[in-house]
Curated annotation (Swiss-Prot):
Catalytic reactions on record: an acyl-CoA + acetyl-CoA = a 3-oxoacyl-CoA + CoA; 2 acetyl-CoA = acetoacetyl-CoA + CoA; acetyl-CoA + H2O = acetate + CoA + H(+); propanoyl-CoA + H2O = propanoate + CoA + H(+)
Residues engaged in binding CoA: 224, 227, 251
Recorded family membership: Belongs to the thiolase-like superfamily. Thiolase family.
SUPFAM superfamilies: Thiolase-like
GO molecular function: acetyl-CoA C-acetyltransferase activity; acetyl-CoA C-acyltransferase activity; acetyl-CoA hydrolase activity; fatty acyl-CoA hydrolase activity
Native species: Rattus norvegicus
Tissue distribution of the protein: Expressed in liver, brown adipose tissue and heart (at protein level).
Protein name, entry field: 3-ketoacyl-CoA thiolase, mitochondrial
CDD domains, per the entry: thiolase
UniProt subunit comment: Homotetramer. Interacts with BNIP3.
Modified residues (N6-succinyllysine): 25, 45, 137, 143, 158, 171, 191, 209, 211-212, 214, 240, 305, 312
One Pfam family of this chain: Thiolase_N
Residues that bear N6-acetyllysine: 25, 137, 143, 158, 171, 191, 209, 241, 269-270, 305, 312, 340, 375
Source species taxonomy: Eukaryota, Metazoa, Chordata, Craniata, Vertebrata
């Protein structure tokens, strides 16, 4: 929808994204959000006591404190005890949804300043044993369930997420070569943006322990900037014989978090915040679960229609790269301009910590739009189970 009140982004930060089992594996999703929240509060000069609500998106609930996630983040960073907190889950759209829900609270005047976040520690996703709480039968083998793999499989249509991408490849005539070439482009664009310092404004460095002692992590760990097309072409398909999806052209499992602080126009004036961008509108749409990756098409189309804008008005477009064929299907459907779409690479390069990607995309669009002097940007993600979500922002510089 288009917003009923003026809502502005006054801070947007994210952690570097860690590789699966990498440098961030010992930090919980709560820890990661705390790092991003502290950085956002500091960068936006937002006193914690001005926060009226804390909303954090998280999917896997992978740590023992996950049920308390948003509440603990607020308390850790000094938000008043009286301020409420909500942990939500719209799967891969959770980071975007935290901002959408924050906008709704501001538009209904339930809040004036909201700390919105998205986070995931995929590395900490546990194995579980079901049906043992009330005892087991003699001789019954206990089965360990990988909660991460289970979460990436849609039991309703009995398809792993990768197969939904294969369905899109077949429907839109997308070849394996198309996918590998796009994956290479994602890595190369990430490399160019990283070397140019284009992630610096959004990044919240983290001190990590390594074999060489403590060091500051400020670069995404999953990216493989030296990747070649030949290397990508040599990888086997994962989900289907002669398929298109490989480990090299799918988003990387990773760990990371982002925080976007939003405020009403009244709060911006009252607290003298510096608005970085205005939230123009958003849209959520359902789609066929068997081709869930096409979700950004109705989501982006719906958001633009509500806002009275078109794709030509957008200076930047960022669609989460869950899988190369999924992104290419969206690009083909909407006829997206490659020169302004995913300009700094995407999840194929830097990883997709489920709940964190919407926050990461929004933070990057905020700062990249300002760097380029553009006016409008739209970010979007497909969502397992068959949904899409999108968010339109406007540069206030």
């Amino acid at each position: 929808m288009a917003l009923l009140r003026g809502v502005f982004i006054v801070a947007a930060k994210r952690t570097p994204f860690g590789a699966y089992g990498g440098l961030l594996k010992d930090f919980t999703a709560t820890d990661l959000t705390e790092f991003a929240a502290r950085a956002a509060l500091s960068a936006g000069k937002v006193p914690p006591e001005t926060i009226d609500s804390v909303i954090v998106g998280n999917v896997m609930q992978s740590s023992s404190d996950a049920a308390y996630l948003a509440r603990h983040v607020g308390l850790r960073v000094g938000v008043p005890t009286e301020t409420g907190a909500l942990t939500l889950n719209r799967l891969c759209g959770s980071g975007f949804q935290s901002i959408v829900s924050g906008c709704q609270e501001i538009c209904s005047k339930d809040a004036e300043v909201v700390l919105c976040g998205g986070t995931e520690s995929m590395s900490q996703s546990p194995y579980s044993v079901r049906n043992v709480r009330f005892g087991t039968k003699f001789g019954l083998d206990l089965k360990l369930e990988d909660t991460l793999w289970a979460g990436l499989t849609d039991q309703h249509v009995k398809l792993p997420m990768g197969m939904t991408a294969e369905n899109l490849a077949a429907k839109y005539n997308i070849s394996r070569e198309d996918c590998d070439r796009y994956a290479l482009q994602s890595q190369q664009r990430w490399k160019a943006a990283n070397e140019a310092g284009y992630f610096n404004e959004e990044m919240a460095p983290i001190e990590v322990k390594t074999k060489k002692g403590k060091q500051t992590m400020q670069v995404d760990e999953h990216a493989r900037p030296q990747t070649t097309l030949e290397q990508l072409q040599n990888l086997p398909p994962v989900f289907k014989k002669e398929g298109t999806v490989t480990a090299g052209n799918a988003s990387g499992m990773s760990d990371g978090a982002g925080v976007v602080i939003i405020a009403s126009e009244d709060a911006v004036k009252k607290h003298n915040f510096t608005p970085l961008a205005r939230v123009v509108g958003y849209f959520v749409s359902g789609c066929d679960p068997a081709i869930m990756g096409i979700g950004p098409v109705p989501a982006i189309t719906g958001a633009l229609k509500k806002a009275g804008l078109s794709l030509k008005d957008m200076d930047l477009i960022d669609v989460n790269e869950a899988f190369a064929p999924q992104f290419l299907a969206v690009q083909k459907s909407l006829d997206l301009d490659p020169s302004k779409t995913n300009v700094s690479g995407g999840a194929i390069a830097l990883g997709h910590p489920l709940g964190g990607s919407g926050s990461r995309i929004t933070a990057h669009l905020v700062h990249e739009l300002r760097r380029r002097g553009g006016k409008y940007a739209v970010g979007s993600a497909c969502i397992g189970g068959g949904q899409g979500i999108s968010l339109i922002i406007q540069n206030t510089a």
